[in-house]
Curated annotation (Swiss-Prot):
InterPro entries: ARM-type_fold. It comes from Encephalitozoon cuniculi (strain GB-M1). This is Uncharacterized protein ECU08_0270. It comes from the Eukaryota. SUPFAM superfamilies: ARM repeat (SSF48371).
Amino acid sequence: MQLPIPRINSTNYQRILMETKQSGDREKTIEDIKNVILLMPHKSPIVTNFISDLARDDAALKDRMVRTINEILETGDIHGLISASFTLRRLGVGGTENLWWVGKIPVVNPLFDGIDLAIPSDSLDKCREEAERMLETVDEESFEEVFCVVQIIKGFRFSVPECLSQLGPISRHKSLVDGIRILHREENSLYLCVLVLELAKKQGFLKILLEDLDSFDHEFRDLLLSLLFECFHSPGEENSVYISSSYTPLRTPEDLELFKHLTTENTARIMKRISGRGKVEKFFHEEEAAAGKEVLRISREEFEKTDFGDKKMFFRNFCLLGSPSISHFLTYLEIYKEHFVLDKEDQKAFLSIFFEVFGGFESFCRIVVGKMVQFKIIDPELVTDFDGNQAL
């Protein structure tokens, strides 16, 4: 059975080339090539070679391709035009060098260098606007790859496995993350989350994603973090949906520290709804349990008896109130924020007590103090040591 041209890859290239030449159905061949050019920009390099190999021995097909290129240039589909521009550039179509997003792509075969780019001015302006919009997220060097990620995710939403298959050859994790970031406000959140859960099985992807997740909308971020926890950390080893001898997402110290740094009280609430309160609370207390340490805790009722005018007593009891949960600490920080308008001396006093109480919990200290710096409670210049017993 003849393989369809849209399935072309390096493995089946020669077979599809031979079958296409033998079929004699030039119109179907042209239509399939046109669809690949417009809808599958990630196949631009291979379809460029395919067109060149077909047209080399078929002058009539080359003439028909010229008409097809003109049809493509007249389309009003902006994303289709940008998709096509990569292949047209590689085929040497004149004028493509003036499009900044393809200008640096080398011409593979100047098969159509006699054709000049004739995109209607209004369509060309819209292409430039869309490209400039994407440039706010990505740099020029990675534009083509990120654009391809975006088009794959949009074009193959009907099947997660098929989408993942098309994304497979894209090796740069940053391009995958950038593409998801561009789409996360407009695409279905659950669809994107399912893609991420699968992509996270690739070692290195989750670290890049978590490092960039602050730039995502908090609603999407909280849902994604909660699903990552449920999928990779919440289950027991015997029930885990993904167990690998070499890498398990959200089990390495790097992944866990980045994950905890991103979690907020709202994240924790969603995590508890999905995974259950017990698993979530255990997760946030694992660090100190593993260290074999305990920190004295006091109830909110006990804390309210504190003399808030005694700064040192207030700071110490506040630490014991929030101890030793990141989410609890940050929640109480919001509740009592009016008492954390501190001058530099008070900031020093707080940091000294904070590290005295929590000095053994490195990740907890780094995350909480980082948040306090972010919230402008603590001057970053005062924070010089996250490792232990003194703040300065």
